[in-house]
């Protein structure tokens, strides 16, 4: 898995340079598990979730039916190590990076054109012997479904099904448009087809 750390600046495509003047290696979405094209995101130091989400808008220009862009602000004293994803619909469309203490990680979960399904999945971060599981779900048909989000810290990777339905020890999911607060993680998912998922982890 590729990880790019950029402190005090943000990641861009290979044709540009980051603010501190260091060239960025070109990485395609195929390298990160997606389709063709450049899709580099990473970690911003000392930046909150709102500023981080704005940087995603400045960098990522994906043309997809459904997505949620996510900013995970790590306010704990631990490094959150990227530990994989669990897909229900769609996939990680960008690089999925570790998040040092005091930094904010940014990425995009997307569902490209094709089957009429939403953008839904779980991302996992490991720290010590614990795993932070973050779930978000954006529907395709808003007449039938709503957006939901959840979080859980446990000793294993939690399934989408359990987090979505609040099963096997998971708290009930939080409806989009509302703040959730579970296991030291505060989160907010907007109710939009192109949504924002804000996460503040204090541990």
Swiss-Prot record:
Compartment(s) where it occurs, according to its Swiss-Prot or TrEMBL record: Nematocyst; Secreted; Target cell membrane
Motif Cell attachment site location, chain numbering: 175-177
Molecular function as annotated in GO: channel activity; toxin activity
GO cellular component annotations of the record: extracellular region; nematocyst; other organism cell membrane; pore complex
Covalent S-S links between cysteines: none
Single biological process term from Gene Ontology: cytolysis in another organism
Tissue specificity comment: Strongly expressed in the gland and mucous cells in the endoderm.
Keywords, alphabetical: Cytolysis, Hemolysis, Membrane, Nematocyst, Secreted, Signal, Target cell membrane, Target membrane, Toxin, Transmembrane
Coiled-coil boundaries: none
Primary location recorded for the protein, binned into one broad class: other
Transmembrane intervals: none
Family designation: Belongs to the actinoporin family. HALT subfamily.
PANTHER family (UniProt xref): BRYOPORIN
Function: Pore-forming protein that forms hydrophilic pores and causes cytolysis. Compared to equinatoxin-2 (AC P61914), it reveals lower cytolysis activity (5-12-fold difference, tested on erythrocytes), a larger pore size (probably 2-3 nm) and different affinity to membrane lipids (100-fold lower affinity to sphingomyelin). Binds to sulfatides (SFT). Shows cytolytic activity on HeLa cells, with a different potency than its paralogs (from most potent to less potent: HALT-4>HALT-6~HALT-1>HALT-3>HALT-7>HALT-2).
Name under which the protein is recorded: Hydra actinoporin-like toxin 2
Lineage of origin: Eukaryota, Metazoa, Cnidaria, Hydrozoa, Hydroidolina
């Amino acid at each position: 898995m590729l990880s790019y750390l950029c402190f005090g600046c943000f990641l861009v495509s290979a044709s540009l340079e980051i603010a501190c003047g260091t060239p960025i290696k070109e990485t395609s979405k195929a390298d990160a598990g997606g389709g063709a094209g450049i899709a580099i995101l990473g970690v911003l130091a000392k930046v909150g979730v709102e500023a981080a989400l704005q940087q995603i808008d400045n960098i990522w220009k994906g043309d997809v039916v459904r997505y949620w862009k996510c900013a995970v602000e790590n306010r704990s004293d631990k490094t959150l190590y990227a530990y994989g994803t669990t897909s229900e619909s769609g996939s990680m469309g960008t690089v999925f990076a570790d998040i040092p203490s005091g930094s904010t990680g940014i990425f995009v979960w997307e569902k490209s054109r094709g089957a009429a399904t939403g953008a839904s999945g779980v991302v996992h971060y490991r720290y010590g012997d614990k795993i932070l599981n973050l779930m978000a779900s954006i529907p395709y048909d808003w007449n039938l479904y709503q957006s939901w989000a959840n979080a859980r810290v446990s000793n294993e990777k939690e399934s989408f099904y359990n987090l979505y339905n609040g099963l096997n020890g998971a708290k009930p999911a939080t409806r989009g448009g509302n703040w959730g607060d579970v296991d030291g993680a505060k989160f907010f998912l907007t109710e939009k087809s192109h949504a924002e998922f804000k996460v503040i982890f204090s541990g």
